[in-house]
Amino acid sequence: MEDLKEDIKFIVDETLDFGGLSPSDSHEEEDITVLVSPEKPLRRGLSHRSNPNAVAPALQGVRFSLGPLSPEKLEEILDEANRLAAQLEECALKDSENAAAGPGRPSPRGKPSPRRETFVLKDSPVRDLLPTVSSWSAPPPSNLTGLRSSDKKGSARAGRVTAGKKPSSIKKESPTCNLFSASKNPGRSPLAQPTLPPRRKTGSGARTVASPPIPVRPAPQSSASNSQCSSWLQGAAAKSSSRLPFPSAIPKPAIRMPLTGRSIPAGKGALAPDPLPTQKGHPSTVGHRAPVSQRTNLPTIGAARGRTSSAARGRVQPLRKAAVPGPTR
């Protein structure tokens, strides 16, 4: 119990020494001896000064003096300081040599930030290894927009020109020459099929009259071709005129027929057949008379012309059945 009481010390009981720099204190420390034993190790508190050069105490009971450094330790410290100074001088010499070799190289002390570093490659030997971009190959963005607009305009104009022009391989042929080619290839040409010119109505009735053939103007070509084309056209017109007088047997719609006092209304049916042809017995061009069903539906000229006399009705021949060509494609 007594040992524990001796180990415990309060702050009030301790005496603090604040005059560590006074020379008198260093002389007093020479007389202080510390006993070290394995049972009670060295106690260091605020009231005791520690020696950094003190060696760890051994287990054996040996006395250590807390005094100034021994001359041997002072020599060791001096040698260590000299070595450090020599190393610092060598480092300084190396830095000065590097600065003399490269004057453009910035010093390590005043090194700027890496973002502000610039590199000039005009006189550098590495410039040939880097990719080069010529000034004319990279136009400014304003020129790029102008080039794009001009390209679009040029393509649009080219499209218009090609659409407006016909291919040069196709030769312009006159209609007369087409007629000659049609005569050579009757199967392929549209003129191979017999076509009749349009008919027109004359007078108050619905009598169909063949219109005269329309003359075709030949294209300006050589005199020989013009003479051949004209002679061929005249021959074709003569043939067509000889075949045209036969009226068509196709009944016209009743709505287009003019309504007269003697004619039958269109809604009740077809016009009444004329009995005169059956009495006189005029033969038809085809060689057969029209059947009864068709004779009732065929519009007669006498019924269409309500104002003509009975004598004129006897003179007029009935409509005859004629072959009508199909629509040409």
UniProtKB/Swiss-Prot annotation:
Residues 94-329 are annotated as: Disordered. The keyword Repressor does not apply. Keywords: Cell cycle, Cell division, Coiled coil, Cytoplasm, Cytoskeleton, Mitosis, Phosphoprotein, Repeat. Residues 70-94 form a coiled coil. Its main location: cytoplasm. InterPro entries: DDA3/GTSE-1, GTSE1_N. Pfam families: GTSE1_N. Interacts with APC2. Interacts with KIF2A. Interacts with ANKRD53; recruits ANKRD53 to the spindle during mitosis. This is Proline/serine-rich coiled-coil protein 1. The gene is Psrc1.
